[in-house]
Amino acid sequence: MLSALLLGSLLAAGPSENPTLETRLAPLAKDHKGKIALAVKNLETGESYYRNADEVMPTASLIKVAVLIELYQQAQEDKLKLTDRVRLRAADKVPGSGILTEHFSDGADFSLRDAARLMIAFSDNTATNLVLDRVGVKSVNRRMEAWGFPNTRINAKVYLGSTTSVAPERTRRYGLGSTTAREMVELLEQLQMSERCRPFCKQAILNHLAKNADKDKFKRFLPADVVVMHKDGSTRDTRTDAGLIHTPAGIVAVCVLTTDNKDRRWHSDNAGNLLCARVAKEVYDHFASTKEPKTR
């Protein structure tokens, strides 16, 4: 009788009370109408989940993380100063996301640090190109390769692929940049663990990522007080997001890459946006449900 009661209680509890990352995330990936790659890693415990994580995918503006890192590494190496001034010219203005093109006058003068703020907080394309003019597209790629990320590459200045591409075939295939979900999570891990950056450099980069204004993707379904340090990207058929999410069980690096998406609407409820948001929510809920997750 006692054994029957115990068996009944176990069955009632069910296996879904504390679902695994795979149980939470695999259905989201399966239901998405488009190509998807995922990588998740708890940086304190090592618990992880990967799906198509080594497939090279377009980044859209997510590649601006690599540009930001190169800027701060060159500052760390005394190749430039973050207080160096840049002057906005009419010829510098490109379309797309951001505020410089529409709201700043020709001749506006500001620091490289402020250009970086605009590049990350508002994904400003013009600001990104101003930073790239100083650090160099090829320098970003050399840095990523030296750090062990050969597939994390920027191919050209934003909206200037026809005249500034350093890899025309990659530009045609991937657009602005490319990466893999695994490489992006490992890059975020190296950044968080200060394996490559001095503390001031690391903290400055993370502060930029924490001020990303996008609320359509990772931050969308998370509690307002959750710290999310991330960069997202969007093109007509691509949605991406990658960052560090603070959970009760530690900091978790997450990357979601999607492309060839059926939903190509420029709308906050785009299916790619919602997928990024749901992945972040499932990851947070998983690690909020236990402070001692499994390591594998």
Predicted feature locations:
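Bacterial N-terminal signal peptides
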Residues: 1-10
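Beta-lactamase-like hydrolase cores
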Residues: 13-55
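Structured C-terminal helix/loop/strand segments within mature extracytoplasmic catalytic/sensor domains
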Residues: 17-25, 134, 185-216, 229-296
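Acidic helix-start/capping segments at beta-turn-to-alpha-helix junctions
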Residues: 43, 81-99, 135-136, 158-162, ...
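Active-site SXXK
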Residues: 46, 58-86, 119, 254
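Second-shell loop/turn segments in exported
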Residues: 51-58, 99-106, 114-118, 126-132, ...
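Active-site-proximal loop and beta-strand segments within enzyme catalytic domains
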Residues: 73-117
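Mid-domain, small-residue-enriched loop/turn segments at the edges of structured enzyme/sensor domains
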Residues: 104, 108, 129-188, 192-193
